[in-house]
Amino acid sequence: MKESVGGIIKLRFALDNAAVRLRRGCLELAVVLSVVLSVRAQEPLPTIRSEANVVLVPTLVRTRAGEIAYSLQSKDFVIEDDGVEQDVTLDESPEQEPVSLVVAIQVGHKASSQFKKRADLSLYDSFYSEEERRDCRKRRVPCPTAIAGLGTMLRDFRDQTNGEVALVTFDSSVYQFQGFTEDASKISERLTKLTPGDDGAAILDAVNYSARLLESRPRNRRRVLLLISESRDHGSVTTTALSLTQQLAASNMLVCSLTFSPLRGRFAEDLKALPSGENFDLLVPLRASIGTLRKNVAQDIAAVMGGEDGKFKDKTTFDATFASITNGIRGRYLLSFQPKQPKPGPHPIRVRLRDSRKDLVLRARSEYWATEHQP
C-alpha cells in the first residue's frame, strides 16, 4: 500500500514538473514570437502589384545637361491614357523591389569579329581607336573587345539593385547563354566564353525570347531587358515587329538598347578586299543609310517601352553609355496607374509634369496593351 501511495506521489510530482516546464516553454515561445513580429512589423513590406489591372510607367527625368532629376512627387506627374488623366501612384521604396535583368548580346553578323582571337582583326574593326590598333600591332595581340568591362559593370549593377542577371546571345538563332543568377562571378566568367556567331542578327527573335524569360520571373520584381546589338534586324523568323510590339506593350518591362553601326567596319573590309584599280560602289553607303533609317529596330523597341538607347563605337564609349543607361534604370520614378477605361487593345500613354518645365526632359513608355482579363 505504501509503495502504491509513493508511486502516485512521484507521478504527480513528475506531472507537476512537466506542467511547469511546458508553461515556461510556452512563455518563452510567446516572448520570441512577439519580438519577431515586432521586428517584422517595423520592416517595410515589398510592393506586390498585380499586372492584371496596374500599368507600370517607370519614368526617367533628366535635366538638359543629362543629370537625373530627383525629389519629384506623385502630384508633380500627369499620366494620360488615350487623353484621359489617370490617378498616379508613385512607389516610394523602389529599393524593396529587386531587379531581374536580361542582357541580350549580338555575337553574329558584324559583331562576330569582336570574339575572334586574332590580332590582325583589330586593324579593320570599327570598335577600335587608331591608338588601340597601334598598340595591338606592337604587342601582336588581339585588342580588347568593346564590351570587355561588361562583367565588372554588371556586378556593380547587381549589387546596387539586389538583382539577378541572365545572358542571352544571338546570331541567326537565339541561345540562353546563362540562366538567372545572383552570382556576379558566374556572369563575368561566362562573358569570357563568348564566341563568334554566324552571319545573322535576329534582333526581334532575341527580344522575343528575352521578354519571355523575364515574364517567368516573380511579379514583385522589376524586369529589364538590355539589348547590345546593331540597329537593323537580320534574319528573325519567330516574330514580327508588330506582334513583338504588342507583346511588349502588354507587359510591364523596361527595354533599353546599346547599339553600334556596322557600316564603318564593313566599308574598311570591302576596301581591303578590292583588287587594285577596281572602282568602289559609292551607292553602297547610300543604300545602307536609307535602310537604317527605315529599320532602326533596336532604338524603336526601346522608345516604345520608354527605355534609353545609346550608341557606342569603342570600349570607352561603351563603358560611358552603359553607365549612363544603368544609372537611368536605377534613377527612374516608379509610376503606375489603374486604367479607368481598360478597353482591350492598344492605349497611347502620355506622361508629363503638371507644371511644365523646359529644363527637364521626361522619358517613359508611350503605350500599353490592355488584355481581355482586365476588369
Language-model segments: residues:
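N-terminal secretory signal peptides that target proteins for export/translocation
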Residues: 1-23
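Intrinsically disordered, low-complexity segments enriched in glycine/proline and serine/threonine
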Residues: 5-8, 13, 31, 133-137, ...
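Bacterial N-terminal signal peptides
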Residues: 25-38
